[in-house]
């Protein structure tokens, strides 16, 4: 219970068209990527257009941001981080050819599962995220840092 309230309070979705959305916000379907060229006023692209507005919409009194966004969207926030912010990127990887790689489809599914996990467990402390073990992913403490939590998907051979 309270899962919808949790995501409505804690989850923010970055949109190239709308800016920052809450899960229950109504929108009209559109197709616009953040990296699209767009001449709007004095801006030549959407990163310039949005400026630091997206950052100020997602930061709150905790000064903690758990980043599940793609690189395309997380750039909108990272540029404006301050030393007081605790910004943690969650990465979902798997072994391939002796190195860790991110497979887009699996990473997208894992990001959704992470949101579900956080809502179901009402996560307030970022360290509690490390217990996530859905879709075969496990936290890798040995290669993670305070700024990046790396989860590796264990594949069946």
Identify the function of each model-found stretch.
Residues 1-146, 150, 154-157:
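Internal, well-folded beta-alpha domain core
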């Amino acid at each position: 219970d309270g899962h919808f309230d949790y995501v409505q309070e804690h989850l923010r979705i970055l949109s190239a068209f709308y800016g920052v959305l809450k899960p229950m916000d109504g929108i009209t379907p559109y197709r616009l990527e953040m990296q699209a060229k767009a001449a709007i006023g004095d801006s030549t692209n959407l990163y310039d257009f949005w400026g630091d507005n997206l950052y100020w919409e997602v930061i709150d009194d905790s000064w903690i941001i758990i980043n599940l966004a793609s690189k395309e969207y997380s750039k909108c926030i990272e540029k404006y981080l301050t030393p007081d912010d605790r910004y943690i990127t969650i990465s979902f990887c798997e072994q391939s050819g002796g190195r860790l790689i991110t497979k887009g489809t699996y990473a997208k599914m894992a990001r959704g599962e992470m949101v579900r996990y956080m809502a179901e467990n009402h996560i307030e402390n970022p360290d509690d995220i490390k217990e996530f073990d859905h879709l075969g992913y496990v936290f890798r403490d040995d290669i993670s840092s305070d700024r990046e939590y790396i989860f590796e998907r264990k594949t069946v051979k």
